């Protein structure tokens, strides 16, 4: 079976792949948003959309930065004159520059998405470590279809890969921060995809990686799910193949419903765990409507699609030198790996993690015993937060150089 990739170097949607592109005359810029795990459990915790600010009021202070790469060539062959990476930092870089941990963002997230790990009594103590949290292309803050001028605005923005994101952050670390080695790369979901890619593309750049609720490849079932979500947006007449003059709200809401169906486990819905932390009087219908209408507050449709295209193309086996051989790429990983799938994840099934673990030389497979599906990998409740922090703390201690 052949995947139906649109191999155009620009952002396209399959149902419209042969239609003539129309110049985009009106810029639709997304409202600035906080896309953290508080977003993933948006209704449960009644988290409102805010400008980029910490979802955790007890989170340590962070600093926001921007790094611009001139003439950044993507894997598609398209060169962006200026590629911007937005990132946050916690703590201070020591003189030896050897206290750095990288945490790349998950889907449509900003740089605050790992604050469940950051704190004096948590796995990552910013008084001792320098933590760098980056935002992927398409976040709406880093270079994205919504914020890039013509000729790369909207659907003309190039499709970017996980490797493109890794390469951009490698430039950031080496050229901007003068950091040539990391203590760890820690990632959730698409952040886990980036962590695996780091360990294959730059096998000695980091001492170890941690991957929660994410795999080294997007498998066929995941590809089909992503295509269904992309098509849900594209079938909104307002979308106009990405050249819209207002957001395709109906399409984005249809996308959000599909996404929500896969976000948690069947048991989570059956046991009505959505009631935990919910306001009095909350119903299933109101919960579902909240996800439908407010899943990615202010999100731009082209940005949403771009990151799904990035996700679809993820495969460490296609890294140059491995000729599409996933097993050989995984076997090349030289550093210890803490692999933490959620036992009930429908996005990244635990079976895929078990399969991949069989080819990684030094792996600790530690599934998260949770009913919270995919979100379990980002600490959506106290039990999962404790399990993750304890496991990651132990792994970092045991594998310290």
List each model region and its residues.
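Catalytic-loop region of hydrolases
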Residues: 52-103, 111
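N-terminal cap/lid subdomain of alpha/beta-hydrolase-fold enzymes
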Residues: 88-151
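Conserved acidic catalytic loop of the alpha/beta-hydrolase fold
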Residues: 163-183
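Conserved hydrolase catalytic core segment
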Residues: 181-220
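Alpha/beta-hydrolase-fold enzymes
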Residues: 205-206, 211-294
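Short beta-strand/loop motif that positions the catalytic acidic residue
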Residues: 333, 339-341
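Conserved alpha/beta-hydrolase "acid-adjacent" motif
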Residues: 346-352
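Catalytic active-site module of serine/aspartate enzymes centered on a nucleophile-bearing elbow/loop
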Residues: 363-401
